[in-house]
Amino acid sequence: MSWRYLCGMMGAEKGDLIMSENQDTKKVLLLALSGFELLEFSAFAEVLGWAKLEGGLAVEYDTAGFAREVRSTFDVPVTVDRVLWRRGAGVCSPVSVCAEDYDALAIPGGFEEYGYYEEAYRPDTAGLIRAFHKAGKPIASICVGALALGSSGILEGKKATTYALSGGHRQKQLAEFGAEVLTDEPIVVDGNLITSCGPSTAAGVAFQLLEMLTDRESAERVKKLMGFTPDH
């Protein structure tokens, strides 16, 4: 299945939503690493999809992975829009994925048993993350997606968090990457970097990213449209 704009299809009446012609479109690269968590992936897709379709906001996303079909946690196959260029492939081409073409990067977490860290720790992945960070663009991760950020080196000296259960060993790993781990915060924002402590934070992270791309009022409006209470 393709996740491109399948979300938020509750259906506004034709003509209900009109985007401003001078509204710059914000584009997010939604990364689907092998073994990614569907819940976390879909939170980004849903919130951005609702923001565009029901909220009338100029936001959209491309999904990307190291293969056209990516197996998520529990072996659910997902077809992505773009295939990540591999190290040594040279400069970006029309079929490559370049940070300069996007305004933000979203990284769901995943399971080790389904090969998540094999791709999360790839030099290609680290290079992509560093490119977004160098450009000052928002990077939002959920749960162990923060470990991909840590592996890239961008969390050194930054406040962050990651999966908090199972004895906190993932948080210890994050600390080894030089992050200042906040163990009592479900979502941590340090500048343009968003990290979180588990799958339950997925929607909150997605709304935080939407706020960074637009504004608080717009994010709260989409949250209300989706039926979330002000505290969730």
What is the predicted function of each stretch?
Residues 142-143:
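Short, thiol/selenol-centered motifs that function as redox-active sites or metal-ligating centers
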